C-alpha cells in the first residue's frame, strides 16, 4: 500500500539524513561523494512525499512560517532565498519546541480548550491585505475544535519524546554554521519583533494539525 511504502521511505529518509549529518564538512567543501549523498537524501524526501500523498515528510511548521512571510502580512518584502527563509524558520520552530519540551518535563505545561484568540491579530494582518476571507475558508472547520483537552493532555508525554528526538538548539546551530546556513531572522532581513506574531499566525497558512497549531491550546 502507499502507506506501507511511505513508511519504508520514511526509514530510508531518516537513514539518509543521518548520513548527510555525518558528512556536513565534506558537503560544505563540495566533495563529490558527499554531495551525492545529499542529493540522494533530497530524492528520498521527494519520494516520501509522493508515497504519503502530501508534503509533510519535507514540510512542517517551518514551511508554514515561510508561507506567512511570503504573504508579507507581518513583514515587508524579503530578498532572501526560499532555503534561507526555511533555515531561519527551522531555528525559530526548534527553539519553541524545545521550550515546550522543557515545560512538559517540569510539569509546567497546561492544556486548555481552544478559543479563537487571534481574531484581532488576523484582522490586523491578513485583513489589511484583503485575504482574510480566503484564510478563513482554508481553516474552516477549525481543526482544533476536534481536539479534546483530555486527548492532548494524555499526548504530552509522547510529544515530549518526539521533541527530544530533535537536535539540541546548539547542535543545530553548529550544523548550520558548518554548511553556511542562516540561523537568525535578522539574517534574512526580519526584525525580532515579528517572531511572536509569526509563531501565532503561521499555522493558519495551511490547514494542518501541526504542533505549532496545537500550541494554541497550551500555556507554558
Per-region residue spans from a language model:
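Short, charge-rich amphipathic segments
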Residues: 3, 17-32, 130-138, 157, ...
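Electropositive phosphate-/nucleotide-binding environments in soluble metabolic enzymes
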Residues: 10-21, 28-39, 59, 84-87, ...
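Single conserved hydrophobic/aromatic residue that forms the stacking wall/gate
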Residues: 1-9
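Generic alpha-helical structural element
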Residues: 27, 34, 54, 58, ...
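Intrinsically disordered or highly flexible coil/loop and linker segments, enriched in small
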Residues: 26-33, 47-55, 74, 78, ...
